[in-house]
């Protein structure tokens, strides 16, 4: 991607209470409070990440994501494709204010091909403020604001057609 305004994620429609209810087996996946990476690992033999973009961006590049994060001079952006048995299962976009990266959290800028969940869920001081559910046509998405040692980051995930979210019943 040459233009920093581009994203691997298409525009998503975030659901409200006025939208039809989410099917139970889909909602079970979307409201997962633990590591999505671990959950995916129950449905394949091999998970790997294809990093698409890792760089610092300014607040004006955040668009509507800015409403979910505090003001910062810059933000770490990481966009990846999560693969299960070499099939694309999920597009992930993580936005982290620079202040969240201080101290022990600076490892977040060096994850490379390590899934975000492997890092986040190995830390005792991880909390989740909320999960929003969204869609892009027939694909489901979720957005979570997480906190590491009280400092926020925003994670948006789009579940691709090959994802087990569409083919399995709840575990």
Curated annotation (Swiss-Prot):
Tree of life domain: Bacteria
Pfam families: Chor_lyase
Annotated GO CC locations: cytosol
Reactions it catalyzes: chorismate = 4-hydroxybenzoate + pyruvate
Gene Ontology MF terms in the entry: chorismate lyase activity
GO BP term (any one): ubiquinone biosynthetic process
Subcellular location: Cytoplasm
Gene3D superfamilies recorded: Chorismate lyase-like
Binding site for substrate: 36, 78, 116, 157
UniProt entry keywords in alphabetical sequence: Cytoplasm, Lyase, Pyruvate, Ubiquinone biosynthesis
EC number(s) reported in the record: 4.1.3.40
Pathway it works in: Cofactor biosynthesis; ubiquinone biosynthesis
InterPro entries xref list: Chorismate--pyruvate_lyase, Chorismate_lyase_/UTRA_dom_sf
Signal sequence coordinates: none
HAMAP family on file: UbiC
Protein family (similarity comment): Belongs to the UbiC family.
Functional description taken from the UniProt entry: Removes the pyruvyl group from chorismate, with concomitant aromatization of the ring, to provide 4-hydroxybenzoate (4HB) for the ubiquinone pathway.
Protein name: Probable chorismate pyruvate-lyase
Organism: Bartonella henselae (strain ATCC 49882 / DSM 28221 / CCUG 30454 / Houston 1) (Rochalimaea henselae)
Gene that produces this protein: ubiC
């Amino acid at each position: 991607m040459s233009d920093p305004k581009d994203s691997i994620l298409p525009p998503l429609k975030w659901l409200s209470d006025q939208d039809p209810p989410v099917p139970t087996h889909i909602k079970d996946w979307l409201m997962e409070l633990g590591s999505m990476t671990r959950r995916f690992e129950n449905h394949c033999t091999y998970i790997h990440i294809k990093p698409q973009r890792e760089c610092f961006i300014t607040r004006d590049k955040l668009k509507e994501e800015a409403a979910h994060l505090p003001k910062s001079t810059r933000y770490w952006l990481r966009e990846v494709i999560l693969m299960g048995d070499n099939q694309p299962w999920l597009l992930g976009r993580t936005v982290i204010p620079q202040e969240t990266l201080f101290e022990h959290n600076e490892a977040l800028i060096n994850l490379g091909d390590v899934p975000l969940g492997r890092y986040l869920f190995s830390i005792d001081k991880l909390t989740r403020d909320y999960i929003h559910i969204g869609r892009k046509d027939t694909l489901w998405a979720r957005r979570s604001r997480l906190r590491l040692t009280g400092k926020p980051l925003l994670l948006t995930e789009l579940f691709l057609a090959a994802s087990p979210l569409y083919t399995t019943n709840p575990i």
